[in-house]
Amino acid sequence: DYGGNVGASVDPKIAATWRITEELSLRGSASTTFRGPPQSLLAGKGTALSYVGPTASFKAIDTIGNAGLSSEEAFSTNIGLIYQNESFYASIDYWAFTFEDSFQTEGFNQLLGSYSANGCIVDGAATDSVVCNTIGAHIFPVAARSNLASTERIEVNWLNGTEIKTSGVDFKAEYTFSDVMNGAVSVGLDGTYGLEYKRDAGLDYTGSVVLAPAADLMGKLNYNAGPSFTSKPELKLAAHVSYETDAHYGGLVLRHVGEYDDLGAPARLPNLATIEDHTTFDVNYIYRGFDGLTLSASVVNLTDEDPAEARGDLAYDPFTHNAFGRMMKVGFTYTVMGK
């Protein structure tokens, strides 16, 4: 019980497994969850610099707490198959989530976009209307309400957003070859494929102004979908092969992100309309031959791949890709056993 506007919740969960054969099982679950807003969302103000399109520069974004936030709730379901024997494991699961009143903030670029789309500037003067005055109250200084390029600050509020529905499929398979040169070799694959991420129309703090239309964000960059919505590639997977003995472990991991679209890419830059798929390799080695001492070494992004090019001030998508390039790590762990 969080009290106040947040309230309380009883969140049941039901889960069942049917063992069809010794090796094949069917599983499923359904549950509800409840999350009360943290104190940082209920009061106070946080300020950060972000790129504001109409100004072509970074400006101050003030995020205002909302004492009227209610709880965030979700309903989740899952159904899947598992196959397992002494050497092989495989599973596939369908999952779905429905979120209600999720914690979101108004999109600052969406506010400015809506201000323009509603004709709030005519002949260099701000339009006096309910919608324009509601949106304009976010834009500072006041003079910027008649010239968005002169905007210096934008205020956005925490709010309970509209409904979100998302679903997808998780999959995993691994086969182990035992007794290979006094060790074991494992090969495997696991990943997820997103089917949908449907969001109802995004509204402002008052609930009277549409800032973004309803949309399915799966498979999109979502650069202008608001700060609460990041890129959502449909496919992410990792494949591995490893060899392990009592003293040694060596492994190679392939990481792959499928391509996804940027619906807002400018026509003059058609190469940005699709963010290309991206594949990297990691190599890991562990030595456990010393008493109490473990040595390890890794190379991340072995082939030094650059992130896929994308629209934005970083020229890549930081929510999906990494710009660090090849990285090498070494480490050790020494265990002292007490009596």
Positions of the model-derived regions?
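Transmembrane beta-barrel strands of outer-membrane/channel proteins
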Residues: 14-16, 26-32, 41, 83, ...
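C-terminal beta-signal and adjacent terminal beta-strands/loops
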Residues: 98-101, 195-198, 254-265, 285-339
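Surface-exposed extracellular loop regions of Gram-negative outer-membrane beta-barrel proteins
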Residues: 1-17, 23-72, 74, 89-91, 96-146, 244-257, 261, ...
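Structural signature of outer-membrane beta-barrel domains
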Residues: 1-5, 33-37, 86-88, 95-101, ...
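Gram-negative outer-membrane beta-barrel transporters
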Residues: 98-99, 106-264
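Outer-membrane beta-barrel signature, preferentially recognizing the C-terminal barrel domain
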Residues: 36-93, 97-99, 154-169, 174-178, ...
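Repeated loop/turn-to-beta-strand initiation elements of outer-membrane beta-barrel proteins
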Residues: 23-26, 87-90, 181, 185, ...
